[in-house]
Amino acid sequence: MFVGHYGVSFAAKKAEPSVPLWVLFIAVQFLDVLWAPLVLLGIEKVRIVPGITATNPLDLYYMPFSHSLVTAIGWSVAAWLAYRLIVPTAPRRAATAVGVAVFSHWVLDFLVHQPDLPLYDNTAKVGLGLWNLPAIALGLEAVLLFGGMWLYFRLGAARRTGMLVFGVVMLAIQVFVFFGPPPASDKAAAATAIVGYAIFALVIRALERLQMVTS
């Protein structure tokens, strides 16, 4: 799961408008934001194995710190607490929205991953494997992304064109990720991921600021 995670960001913004979209963009990818530097440091492990699934060449064989169910719950609670401490004036439900956004990553990954998501440590691995069904996997990404965006638009956002164009670009990137060439190495995959998440967060911050100026 990649761009489908961002659908949760838009839905969470609809549920709790006080949380900036860029915060929610980071929250829904937080487990991967952790995963990337852990791979770069050699703490978590991934191999590039073209064909291991129909749409994703990553053999994610060791990621107990970022993607086990137990640590996902822990990171979600930590995100809730961090938001409460960093933004003490925000309503309690704002921190809850951030925590739920973080945990949603594991839930959506469970749908698409092959059984490589550990329940705890590096054992009892699960995953429904929708990455092996390209049309369904891509359709799910699109439905989640644009479904969440539709909920966000119900807030009465004044300018929708920029958001929609961004959504189309995101989906195009998803198609490239699914069907383009595999990453050159495990480190290249991790570095590309962290740069991509940062760029997406910066773009959505700019688009939301534009919404605020023109609304």
Language-model features: where?
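N-terminal membrane-targeting hydrophobic helices
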Residues: 1-215
